[in-house]
């Protein structure tokens, strides 16, 4: 049996019903115990990111990232890509550095453990 870890806090998940997050972590980070869906594949995100960069409505900076809004509905909680002023910043892996997101998550966790203040952070799986 493989050890599953929460994609927010990194601690082991012992609840058989939990898939990728502790209920408490999900409630704190997403505002709901329901896990939001991110209905995009990597190829779709890359195309959306290109169009947003060309129209100058992406989040500025060196690392590829998008602004996303978390929409809560009766049926499902879902992330949607917005130009600016989203609720979250989604950072994307690149072909050159495919594990950059996991490395940054580790860095944020380590900083928090050292007592440094950080922005809230979590890993979210893409549909692909």
Regions found by a protein language model. Give the residues of each.
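Conserved ATP-binding subdomain of kinase catalytic cores across diverse folds
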Residues: 45-128
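Regulatory N- and C-terminal appendages and interdomain linkers associated
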Residues: 1-46
